[in-house]
C-alpha cells in the first residue's frame, strides 16, 4: 500500500518481490513458453529465467525505427529491456518507448528500471507505464538504497498483468524484516529522487 501511494497507483498495480531477481523469474514463469526477444547486450538473468521456463528466446541488437513502422518481429510476444541498461548504461528515450509500445499491442514489454535513479534522462513513471495494458516495470529498492542484502524489489503495471504475477508468486517470498526496512526507507526518502542530484 505504501508503494502504491508513492506511485499514485491502486494496490492491485503493485507486486512486491524478493529483489528484482525474483521479479525477473516470476515474470518468466508467469508467461512461460512465450516467444521472447531480449534487447542485447544486457543482464544475463533475463535469458536464464526465460529459458528455465520454456521461452523461445531470440536476441535483438537494435530496436525498430520509424522507417520500419516501429514494428517488432511478428513472432515476438514478450520483449525484455533493461533501461538504463546493465552493463552499457544506455537509455532508451521514454517518448520512443511509448511509440514502440503503442505500435506493438500484441507484445508484453518487460522494462527493468532497476537503475532508474542512476540517470537524469526521462524514464517512465510507474503511473505512466500502468496506463499501457502491456507493460511491466521492474524496480529495485536494493539498488536505489544500496542495501543488497535486503532483497526487496517490486513490479508495477496494469492490474490484470499484476494479478497473473501474484497467482504464481510463492507465499512469504518477502520476509517481514525486509518489509519493515523497506517501509522505513520509503518513509524517510527524499520526495523527488532528482533532488539528490541538484
Identify what each model region corresponds to.
Residues 2-35, 53:
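Phosphate-binding glycine-rich loop
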Residues 13, 29-82, 87:
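PLP-dependent aminotransferase-like
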Residues 18, 92, 157:
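A conserved hydrophobic position in a structured secondary element of the catalytic/binding core
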Residues 24-25, 46-47, 88-89, 119-120, ...:
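Glycine/Thr-rich phosphate-binding loops of Rossmann-like dinucleotide-binding domains
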Residues 67-75, 87-144:
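Active-site pre-lysine segment of PLP-dependent enzymes
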